[in-house]
Regions:
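Charged, helix-rich terminal subdomains or tails
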Residues: 1-173
Length: 173
């Protein structure tokens, strides 16, 4: 017999009743257990009929979450994007608005027009060629454009960006 561990992680408003938080994380845990082999994590989106139709709950096996989401996508973003609390002259500036816009374009990736919008957004981020952040920009442009075109990598990148956004959100947001 193999022991498996499934988890549901939800982020709620501080005024949300504990019973509602428990219900929501229970639904997330059930979503994680629906993965083949269980042993998974589901986070953020609460699966329900009332939820936004285009939003999907992030659900991964632990290995994929640790290696692909955190180990690759999140680590890459932390290294090359400069956001609140993670600024450096050699990082590409990406404020909260840019991160949200990026996340929305990744979420709406149904056709070529959105790929063009994503490429345009990346192009608008280009710093001057003599900027210390230019090398970071080149790496970000190449990686994010490639990840956008792969469904699994795009979902992993969305989760990594959500983790960053939740980290930099201010109280009350």
């Amino acid at each position: 017999n193999k022991l498996s561990f499934s988890a549901g992680i939800g982020i709620f408003d501080s005024k949300c009743p504990i019973s509602e938080m428990a219900r929501g994380t229970g639904l997330l845990e059930s979503t994680a257990k629906d993965n083949p082999g269980k042993d998974s994590i589901a986070m953020f989106g609460i699966p329900s009929a009332e939820s936004h139709a285009s939003y999907t709950t992030a659900s991964y096996g632990w290995e994929e979450f640790v290696q692909q989401v955190c180990g690759e996508k999140l680590t890459f973003c932390q290294r090359y994007l400069g956001y609140a609390g993670n600024e450096a002259v050699d990082r590409l500036p990406a404020g909260k608005g840019v991160l949200y816009r990026m996340l929305n374009l990744l979420n709406e990736s149904r056709d070529n027009i959105n790929l063009a919008r994503f490429a345009y957004m990346l192009g608008r981020m280009e710093p001057p060629k003599d900027s210390p952040a230019y090398d970071s920009y080149a790496k970000v442009r190449e990686k994010l454009y490639g990840w956008y075109q792969d469904k699994a990598a795009r979902k992993q990148l969305m989760t990594a960006l959500e983790l960053i956004i939740y980290r930099i959100r201010e109280k009350g947001e």
